[in-house]
UniProtKB/Swiss-Prot annotation:
Listed name of the protein: Collagen alpha-3(IV) chain
Organism of provenance: Homo sapiens
Domain Collagen IV NC1: 1445-1669
Span(s) of short sequence motif Cell attachment site: 791-793, 996-998, 1154-1156, 1306-1308, 1345-1347, 1432-1434
Role summary: Type IV collagen is the major structural component of glomerular basement membranes (GBM), forming a 'chicken-wire' meshwork together with laminins, proteoglycans and entactin/nidogen. Tumstatin, a cleavage fragment corresponding to the collagen alpha 3(IV) NC1 domain, possesses both anti-angiogenic and anti-tumor cell activity; these two anti-tumor properties may be regulated via RGD-independent ITGB3-mediated mechanisms.
Disease: Autoantibodies against the NC1 domain of alpha 3(IV) are found in Goodpasture syndrome, an autoimmune disease of lung and kidney.
Pfam families found in the cross-reference section: C4, Collagen
Domain comment, as recorded: Alpha chains of type IV collagen have a non-collagenous domain (NC1) at their C-terminus, frequent interruptions of the G-X-Y repeats in the long central triple-helical domain (which may cause flexibility in the triple helix), and a short N-terminal triple-helical 7S domain.
Amino acid sequence: MSARTAPRPQVLLLPLLLVLLAAAPAASKGCVCKDKGQCFCDGAKGEKGEKGFPGPPGSPGQKGFTGPEGLPGPQGPKGFPGLPGLTGSKGVRGISGLPGFSGSPGLPGTPGNTGPYGLVGVPGCSGSKGEQGFPGLPGTLGYPGIPGAAGLKGQKGAPAKEEDIELDAKGDPGLPGAPGPQGLPGPPGFPGPVGPPGPPGFFGFPGAMGPRGPKGHMGERVIGHKGERGVKGLTGPPGPPGTVIVTLTGPDNRTDLKGEKGDKGAMGEPGPPGPSGLPGESYGSEKGAPGDPGLQGKPGKDGVPGFPGSEGVKGNRGFPGLMGEDGIKGQKGDIGPPGFRGPTEYYDTYQEKGDEGTPGPPGPRGARGPQGPSGPPGVPGSPGSSRPGLRGAPGWPGLKGSKGERGRPGKDAMGTPGSPGCAGSPGLPGSPGPPGPPGDIVFRKGPPGDHGLPGYLGSPGIPGVDGPKGEPGLLCTQCPYIPGPPGLPGLPGLHGVKGIPGRQGAAGLKGSPGSPGNTGLPGFPGFPGAQGDPGLKGEKGETLQPEGQVGVPGDPGLRGQPGRKGLDGIPGTPGVKGLPGPKGELALSGEKGDQGPPGDPGSPGSPGPAGPAGPPGYGPQGEPGLQGTQGVPGAPGPPGEAGPRGELSVSTPVPGPPGPPGPPGHPGPQGPPGIPGSLGKCGDPGLPGPDGEPGIPGIGFPGPPGPKGDQGFPGTKGSLGCPGKMGEPGLPGKPGLPGAKGEPAVAMPGGPGTPGFPGERGNSGEHGEIGLPGLPGLPGTPGNEGLDGPRGDPGQPGPPGEQGPPGRCIEGPRGAQGLPGLNGLKGQQGRRGKTGPKGDPGIPGLDRSGFPGETGSPGIPGHQGEMGPLGQRGYPGNPGILGPPGEDGVIGMMGFPGAIGPPGPPGNPGTPGQRGSPGIPGVKGQRGTPGAKGEQGDKGNPGPSEISHVIGDKGEPGLKGFAGNPGEKGNRGVPGMPGLKGLKGLPGPAGPPGPRGDLGSTGNPGEPGLRGIPGSMGNMGMPGSKGKRGTLGFPGRAGRPGLPGIHGLQGDKGEPGYSEGTRPGPPGPTGDPGLPGDMGKKGEMGQPGPPGHLGPAGPEGAPGSPGSPGLPGKPGPHGDLGFKGIKGLLGPPGIRGPPGLPGFPGSPGPMGIRGDQGRDGIPGPAGEKGETGLLRAPPGPRGNPGAQGAKGDRGAPGFPGLPGRKGAMGDAGPRGPTGIEGFPGPPGLPGAIIPGQTGNRGPPGSRGSPGAPGPPGPPGSHVIGIKGDKGSMGHPGPKGPPGTAGDMGPPGRLGAPGTPGLPGPRGDPGFQGFPGVKGEKGNPGFLGSIGPPGPIGPKGPPGVRGDPGTLKIISLPGSPGPPGTPGEPGMQGEPGPPGPPGNLGPCGPRGKPGKDGKPGTPGPAGEKGNKGSKGEPGPAGSDGLPGLKGKRGDSGSPATWTTRGFVFTRHSQTTAIPSCPEGTVPLYSGFSFLFVQGNQRAHGQDLGTLGSCLQRFTTMPFLFCNVNDVCNFASRNDYSYWLSTPALMPMNMAPITGRALEPYISRCTVCEGPAIAIAVHSQTTDIPPCPHGWISLWKGFSFIMFTSAGSEGTGQALASPGSCLEEFRASPFLECHGRGTCNYYSNSYSFWLASLNPERMFRKPIPSTVKAGELEKIISRCQVCMKKRH
């Protein structure tokens, strides 16, 4: 019995002995009875016979009466102890215990969270009216009142007296005027200066204990060392005595109860000798025989690599070496016939162990395995030597330390002046600092400013108050008449009433041509005008003096010369959309023609009629124009109205000549600031300024940590601090680099170790019987030819072979008319290639095919190939068609506030307003406060068009060109139309066997056969001989092109690739596309012919018809590049081809017009509750300015104030806003060179880009470096020469049991097997013809996940190599972050006209316009009210039969959206949602239903609500679980958040099928078949249950398609949290159906541990099936 099989219970059968009873006949001696009445028996009486055999037992008699009760028997002997009884059944539940004592009162609970704010209370009642307030303070004087209406005309003054005439006598002062009315209260004063800071307040009391924080996150999985085994515990106390009930069975099947325990018996007789005792402890020196091997233990966990042992003693001389090098590899043999189908294997840990095979040859060295888990802690090492280590990488910046003590005073070191630095780029504008101290007031007057531009006209002032009445005038009797100087021009008169419009005047004379304007944007082409009459050019008129009368209009002049190019006109309105023209012929794209000569100028159109007057424009005020030339004096105006009579004036002397220049006047007021100067040269560096105040922190993310600063000077020793708290244990560190290899130690033999603890007693093995030596085996028959070795590397392409003999040409049937092809260009004759050498004849293959050998182990990975040369740059692709619109993106985060934009360009010049009448100068007012920001102006008219040129009409066809040079080799053409299928040729001789093909995909199930009667299992038959070849069938007719195929099912998992290192191999050559053949119709299934023998080769047949298109050949070598041909003739237009393949994406179009400002985004979700702020934290940064308030109503106009006196000097005002950045000032004077104080340490800078390689450094010092790490394993060396024979070694110890002998000879072939199952799907047919382009298909399913690659050894970074060759230009990157502001550029060109300003004051009402044209159709109106109920309609037609839809979900377990299986349609796609856990309770989704496919992903897809009508989202320790993808987690296993989660979440598709879908599970590693009448949708692994946090989870119904996942993963789902993170956690488990051996159904399961790589062999397989529609 094998040691691995469980012992079976043996049943002892007691044989029954059947005794045949023979009756012995009695001996008769001479007694004859003749008659019935007389018998004469003479002779003596015989002796008594022997006792006969007992007769057979009689039938049992009737049951007797119960006998009387017997006397009690004597006390029996003491019985043997009985066997332990069976375990009794579970007892009845006990009575509930008494209630326990009351517990001690609990500790007081922590204070609860602060409750939410209560609802707004009901408004209170209005209060009672208050008492009368105190009278207010008297107001300030009001402004002067509005001047009253003009009074009545005064009385005429008294006549002047004739006596005492005085000239220039001044009248008496008038009476004081009446006091004005009360003025309005004055404006509030300016705010006072900022007061000094108050004294610091006292420290506050400690705050109340904060609320209890939310439940913490799940802890990280810490992988520690496994602890050492504990010491065996002490022996426990003795258990309670067991009760033994012994039932004695007496004779007559009566049950006697056992009596009381008897007295102790007397000493018994000495017993027989006992069995031999256990062997005693051996104190001798001999070693016992080796015991039998024990049972196989569980596979242990991988151990830790031990420390390297000390160097061993030099070994003895080795045995002679192996055979020499292997010979050259033989040629590849013929492929063997396919083997029989093997039996289904089950993964069973309990299979019996077979005979041990012969040891195989040592395999090649495997790839380096993954790093094992950490071993137990090693022996403490010897103390290491202390050497200073290399400088570590800069650490992260630490927390800000407390302020240090005041440093020692520094030394006054005078540094040498530095060389002047270059001008730095202007820095970013700093944030505004605090207000500075008030500056000194200097009354120095500045130099006079430049002449300012003329100011705008002031608004008319208010008429002044009437002056006092004048003195009566003097009577002038004999005054000489001297005319006074001409008076000032009078005020313009009031506007007259609008006159009647005059008739249309005659056309004026044509003006002289203007100076050419700037080149304008091209306008839209105008419509051609009608031909005008040519006019004669008139003479240029002279400038008439303004006194002349307007002459009669002259005759039209002669036609003038065409004027210079005028300014561009305003773009015309777009014309009406024209009718579509006739469809043009499809032209071949011609070469771009040369630019034609400029066309003749068109004839000028006649002037159109004058349009109606437009409304006055509301343009903004334009920039002031250039100063005009002096105008001609105007015509004399109409005589003014008589002015009031002037007072009599004495003759004024005529003004004399100008006097000498006067003394210099007082300095004038400070002029306006001048125009900024040009940029000065780079000045000398200024002195370092003092430290500025810390600015307001800007809006930005914290920068990366800066590099480590230089070491500071050592500070003074601080005072001793308080002892700190015990720190938290740190996170486990990353494994350190391997240490330097130690020096070999001197090996000393160690002393005897301490005796170990006694081990646990092992299971006793069974003793096997010593077998007899076996007979020597028969010599084996020679083995069959081995199978092919692995496919070799592709060889170099050989030279082209010689030209074969010409084939025989038989005319085939005429093909159908092909489509006319395009005219090809005539190529030049190529050069003749060289003839290659004739190949050697091949070695003839053997007649017999070998049996297939076992799959060889994978070979040693080849050397890493070098990177291939860069390919030539491809031709640019055609622009692609526009892809479908992408899905709406997620709302982005709110952007940061932008910087202040530059000032806008000046507006368009406005039309000049009408001149106002001059007002009386008003009183100078005080400077007003800045007004509120006005409302946004209306949207401007559209700007000038950006269409750079208009497409002209189609040109005439060009002249015939010259013949072109032959063109370069074109791109690969589109596959041609499929040819007709040729007749099938006679079978050729057998070709050489091809390489082993890939495993085909599973074929579709055949039509169901009739249900056969199950036969009994026959014996295995002998393999039959090969049958004859069947006759050829007739070729089927060519089928029509098939529809595009659906996506194929997912192929089998590929073999694992070899690790090739990190560099990719060179790209293989591209194969030529094969010609697609026609897809034939499906032929009828032929009757299976009997298998025939391979007949002899027949005579050579007649040449066959042309064969079907061959398989695609290997790519031929590239030909030499031909010369570029001359341009060919333009061919006739071809027939319109089928639609082309989609091109590459087109280049981005020009930037569109900026769209309107979008609406505000949806408010984002509320953020998490922040942590409690620090006590006495510094004030936060300054907030952004608030939103602009609504514009207030316009106030009533104020009254003018009296001119005030000059006020006292006010306090210093607050600092104004930062102005626009000025131009750089002129270079300053050179400063004194005094070293400034060292500034505070700057913030850490961002990491710089790597610099260019530096110059070679100086030679290093000759210092012996530290011993380097052990190098990686080298390639195995060639086999060495045999060594010399060694000395004879001492006799060895008793060896271990030897390996089993070589395998015996190959057995006879078995009996004929059962017929195999239906074969797999055949090779795919030839390609069908190209169908019309289908719609853009869905994204294909992802490929099967490959086996995990080998572990890459991450090496430390080496020193930077020399700069590589420049790479190909990369793809366009995403826009980078905004850079710092650049230097101030030069002044730009004059800007375009600005947008329209605010509308001016409304003009007079215009005349009624004409009726407008019909407008565009308006937008759809809102839904109307529901109409009245209609009449009952006619009865409808009978309903059509509709298919019932059954919905299921398919999960890809990758980031690709899965496709629906054939015969089903997708409804929508989403993300694979597994289950949620809320309030420590889990609820899951069936993965086969549409509830497991959510269309939006979030780490917290649910919220919870309570009875208070309050809902909380993402604010508790709840979880959600999603199916994951095979994407690898980061090395540090940090949680993933944000956009980085996308590659980890599985995608899914909800599909609708015509019938229900179920899952079938095999509980073996074989994929189960679908039931009869069902079709397969997909195959997978049986997934049953999952649990995670708190051991909560749910499961899948095994009938649901969700229980059959297409990929197996030990961790198939991610755990996500409300805080936005996801990760894999160690307490997440997945449960799968196991693979079972049917022979072990009712046996105890054997515990086993299966490691990665073997997992898929123990998982049950399954298949999802859907019922067919008949």
